[in-house]
């Protein structure tokens, strides 16, 4: 059986981390506009698959969001 590869060929878009692309050195928990981009409308942290962030930056992002929540800069849940 031979498969026609012309139908199934497409170029994958290369996943690029937002923080690596913009040369961010540190994620600050006081930067609410940046953190809001990575939170759902219900207040949950978006996964790496959705945001295309690397593991290093996803860990720092989660810590920054949690710190901002404890400092009452971001609500824990949004209604």
UniProtKB/Swiss-Prot annotation:
Known InterPro entries for this protein?
Ribosomal_bS18, Ribosomal_bS18_CS, Ribosomal_bS18_sf
Q: Does the keyword Transport apply?
A: no
User: Which is a GO BP term held by this UniProt record?
Assistant: translation
Q: Which GO terms describe its molecular function?
A: small ribosomal subunit rRNA binding; structural constituent of ribosome
Q: What Pfam families does the annotation carry?
A: Ribosomal_S18
Spans traversing the lipid bilayer: none
State the NCBIfam families in the record.
Answer: S18 (TIGR00165)
Q: What does this protein do?
A: Binds as a heterodimer with protein bS6 to the central domain of the 16S rRNA, where it helps stabilize the platform of the 30S subunit.
Q: What is this protein called?
A: Small ribosomal subunit protein bS18
The scientific name of the source species is Onion yellows phytoplasma (strain OY-M)
Q: What is this protein's gene name? A: rpsR
């Amino acid at each position: 059986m031979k498969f026609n590869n012309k139908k199934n060929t497409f170029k994958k878009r290369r996943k690029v981390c937002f923080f690596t692309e913009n040369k961010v050195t540190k994620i600050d928990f006081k930067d609410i506009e940046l953190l809001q981009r990575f939170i759902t409308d219900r207040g949950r942290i978006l996964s790496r698959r959705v945001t295309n962030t690397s593991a290093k930056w996803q860990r720092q992002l989660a810590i920054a969001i949690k710190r901002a929540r404890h400092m009452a800069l971001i609500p824990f849940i949004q209604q």
